[in-house]
Design a protein with these regions (language model features):
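Active-site beta-strand termini and strand-to-loop segments that position acidic
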Residues: 95-100, 145, 155-158
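N-terminal "mature-domain start" segment
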Residues: 20, 26-90, 161, 176-187
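A short acidic-to-branched-hydrophobic micro-motif
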Residues: 90-119, 162-166
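Extracellularly exposed regions in secreted/surface proteins, prominently low-complexity, repeat-rich
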Residues: 148-187
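C-terminal motif of bacterial Sec signal peptides marking the signal peptidase cleavage site
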Residues: 15-18
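Bacterial N-terminal signal peptides that target proteins for export
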Residues: 1-9
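Short Gly/Thr-rich strand-loop-strand
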Residues: 116-152
Length: 187
């Protein structure tokens, strides 16, 4: 099941995924196609002191996004902070990317308190709807959840639960892990 152009919503502790993910490619042979947005909205999570003096968009830079995706000629990067709708805290950055051939993507990075890490992880492990995968070699603990074909990487590190979502062509685990490494190297 895919819901075109929908937004992926990840809710702390309760983990609810509204219609999301799927869709576009990087566009080849001059065919530009748009990927759906994938901002992460951290609804009602405990307040956490944010890195980068609160400018979470410093998490990733243009150089962190692969420049060799087939059919593209480099990416133009615009960063947009998304305000938490419940607590009013600025917790999420959405990266608006446009390639030279018009393809677009909106990966995102959010920061949550680690207070509910164990319970949120158990919910993910027990879920029959969204495939869970343990991810070694990243932070103190990490796991991947696939929601409607959309990968979301959760990383526990440096006092944060870091939530990284990607949309095509940045949705594979190695790329999400490279984003996590870049973030952890800057915090």
């Amino acid at each position: 099941m895919r819901c075109k152009g929908a937004t992926l919503i990840v809710v702390s502790a309760a983990f609810v995924a509204a219609c999301g993910g799927g869709g576009g490619t990087a566009g080849g042979a001059g065919n530009a196609s748009a990927s759906p947005s994938a901002p992460i909205l951290n609804l009602g999570a405990p307040t956490v002191k944010l890195p980068f003096a609160g400018d979470v968009c410093q998490s990733l830079a243009a150089t962190d996004f692969p420049g060799d995706i087939a059919g593209t000629s480099g990416w133009t990067l615009t960063k947009t902070e998304v305000i938490d709708g419940m607590a009013g805290a600025k917790t999420v950055c959405r990266y608006d990317l446009t390639s030279g051939n018009g393809s677009t993507s909106q990966p995102g990075v959010g920061y949550e308190s680690v207070d509910n890490w164990d319970s949120a992880k158990q919910i993910a492990v027990k879920s029959t709807d969204n495939p869970y995968q343990a991810v070694p070699g990243v932070g103190e603990d990490a796991y991947l959840v696939n929601v409607f074909g959309q990968n979301v990487l959760y990383v526990k590190a440096k006092g944060y639960s870091i939530v990284i979502s990607g949309v095509d062509p940045f949705n594979d685990l190695p790329t999400l892990k490279s984003f996590a490494s870049a973030i952890l190297g800057r915090i």
